[in-house]
Structures are given as C-alpha cells and as structure tokens.
C-alpha cells in the first residue's frame, strides 16, 4: 500500500503541506503567477484564430515558438467540445521544455479558473515548474491539493520535488526524501539517484555523492552514462582527477563505455590543474579505445600546451585535428594566437588570424586583444590602433584590457598624448578604467615629465573609486622624487605609513633615493636604519642607493662600512656597489683604496661599468692616473 505524502517528505515539508491545506476549499496555487506572464499574453491568446489544434498537436510542438504556443492555448480553450486534458498536457509540456515555467504556471491557473480538470500528469508538470523556479512551498501546496483530490504521487512527482530540494539549498531534505521513498515502497530510478548525486555535488558533498553510486548498485539500480558523467564532472570541478580516473576503471568493469564528453571533462580538469602530460596520455588512451576526440578535446589540450609555452606541441595538435577533418573553433585559434604573440612569433599569429577569417570564424574580444597586444609589443602602434578601429566596426567593442594594452603601448613609445586621448575615450564609451589603466597612464606622464597631469590622474583615480595598489604608489613616489617634488612625495609616504597599506622594500628604496638626490642624506640614512625595526630587509638596490647617497656627501667610511655589512650579512654586493665606491674614492683622490676595490671587484668577476671607465679615462687624460688603472678595470 502506498504511503501518504507526509511520510515521504521530511517533517518540514509536511508542515508546509498541512499549512497550505488548512481551511475549506482548494488553495490558490500561485497568487502572483498570472502577473508573471502579463495580461498581454491573454489578449494575444484569445484574439488568435482557433484553427484545428488537433492537426498542430499531431504534427508535433518541437519547433513551436512561445507566442504561437500561447495562441494555440487560446484556440484550445475556445474549442467546443473542449480538448482532452491529455492534449492540454502536451502543450504545457512543450512550453515547459522552452523553460518558460512562469507561463506554464499561469496557463495552469487559467485552466483551473475555466474548470478544466487537471490530471496527474498536469500536476506533475506544474509541480516540476514550481520546483524549477525554486518555489518549493508552492510545489508542496499543489502536491497537497493533488493528494486531497485522490491522486497518488508517482516517482516522477517525487523526482521533481527532489530536484527542487537539490537546487533550493535543502540537500538534507533531498537525502531524507530518497531514503523515505525506499523505506515506503517507492523504487527510485536512475534519474532519481542521478538528481540526488548532482545535488550533493552542488552542496560540496563529494564523498557522499561518490558513495551513493555504490549504494545505487546495491539497491539494484545500475548507474548509466549520465550518472557517471555527473560524478566525473563534479569530481573534476573539485580537482579530484585521480578519483575521476578511478571512476573510468569502474565504468569499464561495469561495461559502460565512457563517451567523448566524459574524457573531455577529465582532460580539461587535468589541464587546469597542471597535469598536462597526464592529459596527453589520456588523450592517447581514448584514441586507442576508439573514442574519437572532437574539437573540445583538441581545444583543451592546445590551450593547455600554449599556457606552458609548448607551442610546437600545440601546433602539431592543430595539424593533427585539421588532418582528421576536425575543424578548429574560436577557442582553438584564440589559444594559439595568444601563445604565438607571447612567444614573440607574431608573424605566425597573424597567419593564424588570416586562417580563422578564411574559415569564417568571427574573432571575439580575446582574439582582438591578443593581436593588439602583439602589435604593441612589436612597436607597431598604428597597426594596433587600426585593429582597434576594425574591431569596433565589427561591433566587437573594446574592453578595459584592450584600452590598457593600447595605453601602455603608447606610453612606452613616448606617445603619451595618444594614450591620454584613449583614456578620455574610455569615459565617453562608459568604461571605467581599472587600477592598471590609471597606473599605466600615471607612469607614462611622469616619464614624459608631465608631473602636474600625473598627479591629476592620481587624484581622479581616487575620486573615481579605483583603489591604487602598491605599484601605483611606487610609481607615484618615484615620479614625484625624480621630478623634484620630494615634499609632495613625503606627504604621500606619510599617508601610506599611517594607513593599512603594507609598504615593501621598493617603496622604502624609492624614498631613500629621493631623499639622497635632494641632498637630505641624513634623512635617507635615518630611514635606512629604521628598516630593521619595521621588519623590512634591504635588498642590493637599497644598499647601493644608500651607498651612493653617502658617497655624494663624501661619507666614504660609512659607505665602506655598508659594503662590509653586505659581505657579512647579505645581500652580496654587485657590480653597481663596487663601481659606485670606486668612483667615489677616485674623486676623493684615494688611489690605493680605489685599486683595492678594483681588485676585489675583479675577483668577484665584475667589471668596470661605462661611468667608471669614462672617469678613469678622463683622469688618465688629465695625468691624475696612470695606465695601470685602466688595465686593472679591463
């Protein structure tokens, strides 16, 4: 004997059903659902000609559009005698397959008002629609009404509820529902179990989902290809590729042949989690088993190989797929074009672009961004701008990445005005620049000596709510210091120290250099000495900067002490360290110390730089040095 619905669903579900069934009469199914369709639907429906709906139903509803379906409903409700509930169900089912669940619910309520009696199949359709809209309480209310009318829920009814629970963040209710179904004589089928497995993965319960596959078999319900596909997909999304591969062996033992979709899922996951060789091995295995790879298989592998710089392997795969008459798609071309651009093989990238155009594959924003980047990298800025304008003409509108790439290219080529113009154009197009946009332009303006506009762009960045990062501040401080704006740089630096911005050694080095260049070597020294208290370790550039500052004030003993500290505690001195000290001692007239430093530098396999050799040559010309110094340097 079948159980009552209150025994099947969880206690929470039962309370909702009873609450909806209190009082006399039938509950209103969905008080607001009519409004979801809009009354315009009904105007269209009832103004349509009735026609012969039977012929339309016989011919099938697979290609029917929503407006036509609503028009057909209007004709059916006006027909006399009324069509059977079976015929109404066919129409409701067709609309449900269009995923127009709100329309189905509204039509169902219209039928009720016209006293067209619903059957079990009608209730199943409506319950499924409520569940697909995550309106579980309304689905349960309708279930209660259905049972009150004497209809017993079928496995289809309960599977719809199960699906609703799974997608409505009520996975514990879903598990309880399946358990109670089994206890009370219902026999969950493969679809039921697969739905629950999918729900468990949605709620990050992977181990329970995998265990349920074994429970299915124990209960005499064999998992099918769809079930295994759901499990493989769930495992791969979590990065559990080993478990996914083990599942392939289980499928083989159960004589269920994995299809290309399952192999693609695992290959894609292996690629994402950096197991490219394992992905290639699985690719070979699927070919051995007679499973033909498709464009998705090749695209995943090519994209992965490109991301690891294995562009020759990627090119070989492209040749293989073309030879096997598998047409590459947009993803395939994008991966290869981007890889060739980054490898500096721009001629090959352009050839691929030409090839995809010949194949009538329309480039997307990613394609254009890669090519614009390539043109900028090769200082072909006019060509980059042409590509930019061409993509606009093709209704592929530039994004922030496109603008950032072009602005960076123009600023690097000292065409800052062009970069600034692009920045203004972004605003006109309604695009808000990101941190990279503003930082790039600020750097370009500083390099161009336009300190005032660089500061204005920084202020605009803050007022636009775009957060500066450590790179922005580093560029701002460096630009201010190099343009003689130390006081302004100190204001920014003080703000950074008081805020929660974590300062790195590059920021401190920039400020030390700015202080030393402005003649405030004592302030630079104080900041340098405070680094250990701040838990920041100076690098070789910091030491060299401080040594240079000390040397500029002829504090050579202090500078030499820093060299000694570097040799003892690290970081080890480099060519710049020695050359700075050698020049300082030469200018001070201390030939012996200079000679000793040159010998030490040469023992470390460093050589004199252009500035040192130039100074020695001038002193030789003036007769202040003999040729032995030049011989020592070279």
From Swiss-Prot:
Coiled coil: none annotated. The keyword Repeat applies. Keywords: Repeat. PPR repeats lie at residues 49-83, 84-118, 119-153, 154-188, 189-223, 224-258, 259-293, 294-328, 329-363, 364-398, 399-433, 434-468, 469-503, 504-538, 539-573, 574-608. The keyword Repeat applies. Pfam families: PPR, PPR_1, PPR_2. Signal peptide: none annotated. GO terms for molecular function: adenylate cyclase activity. Belongs to the PPR family. P subfamily. This is Pentatricopeptide repeat-containing protein At1g62590. It comes from Arabidopsis thaliana (Mouse-ear cress).
